[in-house]
Curated annotation (Swiss-Prot):
UniProt xrefs under Pfam families: Ribosomal_L18_c, Ribosomal_L5e
Molecular function terms, GO-annotated: 5S rRNA binding; structural constituent of ribosome
Name used for this protein in its record: Large ribosomal subunit protein uL18
InterPro entries attached to this UniProt entry: Rbsml_uL18_euk (IPR005485), Ribosomal_uL18_C_euk (IPR025607)
Summary of subunit composition and partner proteins: Component of the large ribosomal subunit (LSU).
Any one Gene Ontology cellular component term annotated for this protein: nucleus
CDD domains reported for this sequence: Ribosomal_L18_L5e
Species this chain originates from: Anopheles gambiae
Single GO biological process annotation from the record: ribosomal large subunit assembly
Main location: cytoplasm
Matches recorded under HAMAP family: Ribosomal_uL18_A
Gene3D superfamilies in UniProt: 3.30.420.100
Disordered as annotated region, ranges: 247-300
Gene behind the chain: RpL5
């Protein structure tokens, strides 16, 4: 079929239907979303969970969510900016950090569902493919599906690093090794050792050594945070090993500290909760209100409009002339 030019006439604009708002903004791929949220009809109201992975310039977000008519509901979430709590203070957006974030969200959701003791996941990380095996007596493994959004699903992408961390954490996510680092499409072979190096950040350590030998100024500029914290190339593997172990101990999220309201400034303080406002209005005052000593001045009454000075007009009637006889 040849090229057909679209005729934008009156009928075209009359029948035109705009796309969804998030499609117009380029935020949601509804073709993929429809297949991620539609549940089998014989499962009725059972939610279909998704592992949502989103990448930004400074953070990695992993969420467990399911769809409802009114909107998606987030069950559990983990962020890479929480990793300094577990010992990873720099490199919060690389492949190793994505693995740690996926591991963190997996341990949190299993702890929330009280499945963390039944499904410990893969404790010895080798980079090879790992599939969760269901226990004989007990509930099945938590199953969810990877949601990458609009990210490119290339081989070695960080979204698959987060998925690998979630799988090693004990979640049942259908996947293959074709998108992990170390897979060769030409030979159709998978190098698990290369994948392990990416999980423990050894590819960053090798680049640090190479850059330090070739260009020391570029090394100081690119790895300034590593240098300020005293982190060397030989320390990176142990940092991530300790982080994996510490994530499994307290995966729960720490309650954020509430800041005290400002005493003064441009913006007013926060509104008090209803209970405090109710008690404040019902409690008696410590002293009665004092009456004013001086009597307030009464407002001056205004005269009616027709009594005003300019309205008073003297009507002079013309005198009749004397009658002549």
């Amino acid at each position: 079929m040849g090229f057909v030019k679209v005729v934008k006439n009156k009928q075209y604009f009359k029948r035109y239907q705009v796309r969804f708002r998030r499609r117009r903004e380029g935020k949601t791929d509804y073709y993929a979303r429809k297949r991620l949220i539609f549940q089998d009809k014989n499962k009725y109201n059972t939610p279909k969970f998704r592992l949502i992975v989103r990448l930004s310039n400074r953070d990695i977000t992993c969420q467990i969510a399911y769809a409802r008519i009114e909107g998606d509901r987030i069950v559990c979430a983990a962020y890479s900016h929480e990793l300094p709590r577990y010992g990873v203070k720099v490199g919060l957006t690389n492949y190793a950090a994505a693995y740690c974030t996926g591991l963190l969200v997996a341990r949190r959701i299993l702890q929330k569902l009280r499945l963390d003791t039944l499904y410990a996941g893969c404790t010895d990380v080798t980079g090879e493919e790992y599939l969760v095996e269901p226990v004989d007596e007990g509930p099945a493994a938590f199953r969810c599906y990877l949601d990458v959004g609009l990210a490119r699903t290339t081989t070695g992408a960080r979204v698959f690093g987060a998925m690998k961390g979630a799988v090693d954490g004990g979640l049942n996510i259908p996947h293959s090794v074709k998108r992990f680092p170390g897979y060769s499409a030409e030979n159709k072979s998978f190098n698990a050792e290369m994948h392990r190096d990416h999980i423990f950040g050894l590819h960053v350590a090798n680049y640090m050594r190479t850059l330090e030998e070739e260009d020391e100024e570029a090394f100081k500029r690119q790895f300034s945070k590593y240098i300020s914290l005293g982190i060397k190339a030989d320390d990176i593997e142990n940092i991530y090993k300790n982080a994996h172990a510490s994530i499994r101990i307290p995966p729960s999220r720490r309650n954020p500290r509430r800041r005290s309201p400002r005493s003064g400034g441009r913006w007013p303080s926060c509104r008090s909760p209803p209970a405090r406002r109710r008690s404040r209005s019902t409690r008696p005052t410590s002293w009665p209100r004092s009456r004013p000593t001086s009597k307030p001045k009464r407002p001056r009454r205004r005269r009616p409009f027709f009594f005003s000075s300019w309205w008073c007009i003297i009507l002079v009637l013309p005198c009749s002339s004397p009658v002549r006889r």
